[in-house]
Amino acid sequence: MKALWAVLVVTLLAGCLAEGEPELEPEVTDRLAWQSGQPWEVALGRFWDYLRWVQTLSDQVQEELQSSQVTQELTVLMEDTMTELKAYKKELEEQLGPMAEETRARLAKEVQAAQSRLGADMEDLRNRLAQYRNEVHTMLGQSTEELRARLSTHLRKLRKRLMRDAEDLQKRLAVYKAGAREGAERGVGAIRERLGPLVEQGRQRTANLGAGAGKPLQDRAQALGARIRGRLEEVGNQARDRLEEMREQMEEVRAKVEEQAQQMRLQAEIFQARLKGWFEPLVEDMQRQWANLVEKIQASVAANPIPPSSVPQESP
């Protein structure tokens, strides 16, 4: 049990110190992510490699995104990862030995929450690619450069969130595994051996209750502080996720406004072309009529010249 609590404390301290540490480069993080090599981690590694290939947005990726092949591949990789993860979690649950019911329930709840977040990240990624395919189909031969830029930004953010939640799940499974290992190693003899020192410690604490009354309060305060730090970290992560979602929504609104402005410019150009098509024939017809009228007047004047006698002459 002490080993389990030690792992819990180390995990919480690592989470509290994470804000002050410099962010690792993506390549380094990738190498650290799946180092234990559990089956579910291997499956997630395949999903991760496929995602990195999709993120290149090469010509082949663009071609396959036009169909449902990419989303189908991601669905298969997602199902493989979740299946292996559930099997690994069930294996750990079977290995859990004598443990306080409250501790067991809390650990199971934390692992389930981390597992759900990872599954939601994968689902969001698949839905975003499906949305991109639909948007490309509605462009009707127009340029999709802006769509690709938006997709690249979203994939980068989703990939970062997926990595963070996967690492969080790894940490919680490590705590869960520590409890299972301790339960598997614990037997009746070990329990009896531990009960003796615990009873003796209880007697000593009872005898020294007056002198050491402040120690339990200090332990409780430290435990409460650890829980508060964990809660603050969780709230901070949720706030960052919400901020990223709001930024994505603002980018989508800006893109839609620019798209509508482009459509209005195109419609104005079309209307201008139509007006030009309507008035140019009228102007040309008026010019022809005016030219014909001038020619007729000139011809009439040439055919009927003014006689000289009609011009008055000066007397000598």
Swiss-Prot record:
Annotated heparin binding sites: L158, R159, K160, R161, G225, A226, R227, I228, R229, G230, R231, L232
UniProt-annotated stretches for the region Specificity for association with VLDL: 274-286
Description of post-translational modifications: APOE exists as multiple glycosylated and sialylated glycoforms within cells and in plasma. The extent of glycosylation and sialylation are tissue and context specific.
Region 8 X 22 AA approximate tandem repeats, residue ranges: 76-251
Sequence repeats: 76-97, 98-119, 120-141, 142-163, 164-185, 186-207, 208-229, 230-251
Superkingdom classification of source: Eukaryota
Entry GO CC: chylomicron; extracellular exosome; high-density lipoprotein particle; low-density lipoprotein particle; multivesicular body, internal vesicle; very-low-density lipoprotein particle
Gene Ontology terms describing biological process: acylglycerol homeostasis; cholesterol efflux; cholesterol metabolic process; lipoprotein metabolic process; melanosome organization; phospholipid efflux
Modification sites for Methionine sulfoxide: M139
The keyword Repeat appears for this protein: yes
Pfam families per UniProt: Apolipoprotein (PF01442)
Signal peptide annotation: 1-18
Subcellular location(s) per record: Secreted; Secreted, Extracellular space; Secreted, Extracellular space, Extracellular matrix; Extracellular vesicle
Region Homooligomerization, residue ranges: 262-316
Region (LDL and other lipoprotein receptors binding): 154-164
Residue ranges, annotated region (Lipid-binding and lipoprotein association): 206-286
A GO molecular-function annotation: cholesterol transfer activity
Keywords: Chylomicron, Endosome, Extracellular matrix, Glycoprotein, HDL, Heparin-binding, Lipid transport, Lipid-binding, Oxidation, Phosphoprotein, Repeat, Secreted, Signal, Transport, VLDL
Gene3D superfamilies: Apolipoprotein
Modified residues (Phosphoserine): S143
Family classification: Belongs to the apolipoprotein A1/A4/E family.
Function: APOE is an apolipoprotein, a protein associating with lipid particles, that mainly functions in lipoprotein-mediated lipid transport between organs via the plasma and interstitial fluids. APOE is a core component of plasma lipoproteins and is involved in their production, conversion and clearance. Apolipoproteins are amphipathic molecules that interact both with lipids of the lipoprotein particle core and the aqueous environment of the plasma.
Subunit field text: Homotetramer. May interact with ABCA1; functionally associated with ABCA1 in the biogenesis of HDLs. May interact with APP/A4 amyloid-beta peptide; the interaction is extremely stable in vitro but its physiological significance is unclear. May interact with MAPT. May interact with MAP2. In the cerebrospinal fluid, interacts with secreted SORL1. Interacts with PMEL; this allows the loading of PMEL luminal fragment on ILVs to induce fibril nucleation.
Record-given protein name: Apolipoprotein E
Source organism (scientific name): Peromyscus leucopus
